[in-house]
Amino acid sequence: MRIFVIALTLLFGWLQYTLWFGKNGVSDYYTVKDEIEVQQQVNSKLQARNNEMFAEIDDLKQGLDAIEERARHELGLVKEGETFYRIVGEENP
């Protein structure tokens, strides 16, 4: 009977060790849980960025206002009949 109790105690100790520290144990669970939370945050940021890009693509396909705005800001274009004024600030000596 004594050997049986020792064997059960050893078995219980081994099972506890594998539960807490073994492969797919509690420590691995918390590590994976933290990695999932980080990845979900990254995914939500990327999804928001994708939505903004899709909205910009739709705007470029549908309307000329977005194309005109990009041409003005990125290429410095001016409409015919408009006068462009650039105000330059004073440099500090």
Swiss-Prot record:
Residues 1-3 are cytoplasmic. Its main location: membrane. InterPro entries: Cell_div_FtsB, FtsL/DivIC. The chain crosses the membrane at residues 4-21. It comes from the Bacteria. It holds the Pfam family DivIC. Keywords: Cell cycle, Cell division, Cell inner membrane, Cell membrane, Coiled coil, Membrane, Transmembrane, Transmembrane helix. One of its GO terms (cellular component) is plasma membrane. Residues 22-93 are periplasmic. It is a single-pass type II membrane protein. GO terms for biological process: FtsZ-dependent cytokinesis. It is found in: Cell inner membrane. Disulfide bonds: none annotated. Residues 32-75 form a coiled coil. PANTHER family: CELL DIVISION PROTEIN FTSB (PTHR37485:SF1). Belongs to the FtsB family. Part of a complex composed of FtsB, FtsL and FtsQ. Essential cell division protein. May link together the upstream cell division proteins, which are predominantly cytoplasmic, with the downstream cell division proteins, which are predominantly periplasmic. NCBIfam families: PRK00888.1 (NF002058). This is Cell division protein FtsB.
